[in-house]
A protein has these predicted regions:
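Beta-lactam-recognizing serine transpeptidase/beta-lactamase-like catalytic domain environment
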Residues: 2, 8-79, 83-323
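Ligand-recognition elements built from short beta-strands and adjacent flexible loops
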Residues: 235, 272, 286, 311, ...
Length: 449
C-alpha cells in the first residue's frame, strides 16, 4: 500500500492525506486491493480451510481501513538523512565545507555496513553526501554528532511521541533508546534504517527543517461551524518548540534544492518552480529476517519514498509520498515516489497561489507547439520556425522557390524547443510505405543505422 501527505509547513494544516488502495465507504467490507484478492485466491488454491480464509480476509479488511499515514510504522530510510544533516549543522560538528570518504562500506564496531554504491563514492562534500545519499558519509556524520546529541535531536524533532494530530488511532514510533544505543545502532540510525516512525512524524520533522526550525502540531480540522454556519471554533497554529535555527534551516533548504536540481531528485524537478527534496529507499529488514528464519527464503522488500517542499526559497508546503513494497521492477524512491510528487506539485501549486517563474534556460528547453508552415516558401517557413525556437532541415532545394509540401512533425505537435522540424519542398515527399525494422534490444546507435 502507499500513502501521501501534504502539509502547510508553517501552520501544520494538513491539506491532503491519502492511502491507496482505499475502500468504498458505501461498502467498506469489500476488499478493493487486487493483491489482497490474489492472496486469498492463492491461499484457497493451496488448501487453506474456511476458518483460515475467513481470518485472513478479516485481517486484510481491517488493514484496508487503516490510515497508513498515521497508524503504520516504517523505516524512513534516506529521507531521515535530512534530520541527521540538520542536527549536525546546528551543532556545528559539520559545515558545508566538511568532507567525508566512502569506500563502499564503513566498519563500525566490527560490523561492515555497506553503501548502496558497490564502487564507493570516494571523497564527498556535505552537499555531495546528501545528493548521492551516501550511507558511509552519514555514518561518519552520526559519529561526529554522537549518541547523546543524536538522541536529543531525535526527540526534539518529535519522533519519540505521536504528533498530536486531531485524528484517532495515531501510532507512536518504535526506536532504540538512548540507553540501548550502541555504535552500530547509531550508525544505522544516522541514515534512517533502525528506528521506525509514522509517515506523519517524518513529514512534521521535515516541516521543521525547512520552515525556520519550528516543530508544529499537524491538524485536519481548520474550523468548526454551528448549524447556522457560524464559526464556533478555529484551530490555531501550535508551535511545540524551535529545534534548529533559521540559519541552519536556510542551509538545509539550499542543500535539498540542489538535490532536486541535480541527479538525486531530478524526477521531482518542475520547470518554473524551486523544489527541494530527498529520496529514500528502505530495506524492510525485520520482515526479511523473519521470512528467512521461517522459510529459508532470501528475499528483501523495500519501501521507496520521496519528501519535498516548495517553493525552496520560501517554503509553504511539504509533501511525503511512500509506497510499501512496490511490485514493479523499480523500487528506488527517486524512481517510484518522486514522479508522484512532481505530478501533484505541478497541478496543485497553482491552486495554492504558487505560480511558476521560468528561467531563461528553462524557457529555452520547454516544449512548444510546432506552427503550421505548409504552402510557405522555404525562407518564410524557416523564419517562422526559428522564431518559435525550432531548427529546420530541408528535403529539397530551398533556393528553388518551391513551397513546403509536408512538415514533420505535423503542426500542433508539442516538442522541445531546439528540436529540428523537417520540411519537404515541392514533390520531394515520398508517399511510398516502408516496413519499419524491429530495433528492440538495440543500442541507440545500432537503431539509427
Amino acid at each position: 500500500r502507499a500513502c501521501g501527505i501534504i502539509m502547510n509547513c508553517n501552520t501544520g494544516a494538513v491539506l491532503a492525506m491519502a492511502t491507496a488502495p482505499s475502500f468504498d465507504l458505501n461498502n467498506p467490507s469489500e476488499l478493493k486491493s487486487s493483491f489482497d484478492l490474489q492472496t486469498l485466491a492463492e491461499m484457497k488454491e493451496s488448501g487453506a480451510t474456511e476458518e483460515e480464509l475467513d481470518a485472513k480476509e478479516a485481517s486484510l479488511r481491517e488493514q484496508q481501513w487503516k490510515n497508513k499515514a498515521i497508524t503504520e510504522l516504517y523505516y524512513p530510510g534516506s529521507v531521515f538523512k535530512t534530520v541527521t544533516c540538520a542536527s549536525a549543522l546546528e551543532e556545528e560538528v559539520v559545515s558545508l565545507n566538511s568532507t567525508f570518504h566512502c569506500a563502499a562500506y564503513e566498519m563500525v564496531a566490527g560490523t561492515k555496513i555497506k553503501c548502496w554504491s558497490s564502487y564507493g563514492h570516494g571523497t564527498l562534500t556535505l552537499q555531495q553526501a546528501v545528493t548521492k545519499s551516501c550511507n558511509p558519509s552519514f555514518i561518519q556524520i552520526g559519529q561526529l554528532l554522537g549518541k547523546d546529541k543524536f538522541c536529543d535531536y531525535f526527540e526534539a524533532f518529535g519522533f519519540t511521541e505521536p504528533t498530536g494530530i486531531d485524528l484517532p488511532g495515531e501510532s507512536g514510533s518504535l526506536y532504540v533508546s538512548r540507553e540501548n544505543m550502541g555504535l552500530v545502532e547509531l550508525a544505522s540510525s544516522s541514515f534512517g534504517q533502525t528506528n521506525k516512525v509514522t509517515p506523519l512524524q517524518m513529514t512534521t520533522a521535515l516541516c521543521a527543517i525547512v520552515n525556520g526550525g519550528y516543530l508544529v502540531t499537524p491538524y485536519v480540522v481548520d474550523k468548526m461551524l454551528d448549524s447556522d454556519g457560524n464559526v464556533v471554533k478555529t484551530t490555531e497554529t501550535r508551535i511545540k518548540r524551535q529545534v534548529i535555527s533559521e540559519e541552519t534551516s536556510v542551509q538545509m533548504r539550499q542543500i535539498l534544492e540542489t538535490v532536486v536540481n541535480e541527479n538525486g531528485g531530478s524526477n521531482a524537478y518542475i520547470n518554473g518552480y524551486r523544489i527541494g527534496g530527498k529520496s529514500g529507499t528502505t530495506e524492510k529488514i525485520d520482515e526479511y529476517n523473519k521470512l528467512k528464519a521461517e522459510t529459508g527464503v532470501d528475499h528483501m522488500t523495500y519501501v521507496p519514498s520521496f519528501a519535498a517542499f516548495a517553493p525552496a526559497d520560501d517554503p509553504q508546503i511539504v509533501m511525503l509520498v511512500m509506497a510499501d513494497t512496490p511490485t514493479g521492477t523499480q523500487y528506488y524512491g527517486s524512481a517510484v515516489a518522486a514522479p508522484v510528487v512532481s505530478a501533484v506539485f505541478k497541478e496543485g501549486l497553482p491552486h495554492l497561489g504558487i505560480y511558476p517563474t521560468y528561467t531563461a534556460e528553462e524557457l529555452a528547453k520547454m516544449d512548444a507547439a510546432v506552427p503550421y508552415v505548409m504552402g510557405m516558401e522555404a525562407q518564410r517557413a524557416e523564419a517562422k520556425l526559428n522564431a518559435e525556437g525550432f531548427e529546420v532541415r530541408y528535403v529539397g532545394d530551398p533556393a528553388s522557390g518551391a513551397t513546403v509540401s509536408t512538415q514533420i512533425p505535423a503542426s500542433g505537435s508539442s516538442i522541445p524547443k531546439g528540436s529540428t522540424v523537417v520540411l519537404y519542398l515541392g514533390n520531394e515527399y515520398d508517399l511510398e510505405s516502408a516496413v519499419i525494422p524491429d530495433v528492440t534490444g538495440m543500442t541507440v546507435s545500432q537503431a539509427n543505422e
